[in-house]
Amino acid sequence: LRLECARIMAGQKKEEPAGRAKITKAYNLPCHYVLHTVGPVICGAVTKTHREKLASCYRSCLELAAQSGLHSVAFCCISTGEFHFPNKPAAQVAIRTVREWQRKNPGKIEVIFNVFKNIDYEIYNCLLR
């Protein structure tokens, strides 16, 4: 997986911009494919542009998944953690973007929000009610 990602990056000859998606085989992971995206890095206050780039991450992944014939996608909390997007605003963008995409593409892809931290579980649990 790491070698395939390195080949993709070498072929591009530049870093992947925020908001786009790529797909690779999953190799030894318990799935068939991995969708890769780069979220916005937050330094200071979250702006409209940050929110738009984060939404683009989710839309790009969903479009690529649909084009690749996938029926389900599990999303982690994109751009939180190391990239410092605050958890609740990131979850709001994720849920809104996925719901909008699913309304326009009914029945195409099941989405799972896979969270690692209790705080994210609480946020998503509250927002998805």
Regions found by a protein language model. Name each.
Residues 1-67:
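Glycine-/small-residue-enriched capping loops at alpha/beta junctions
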Residues 42-129:
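Phosphate/ribose-phosphate-bearing ligand recognition and processing surfaces
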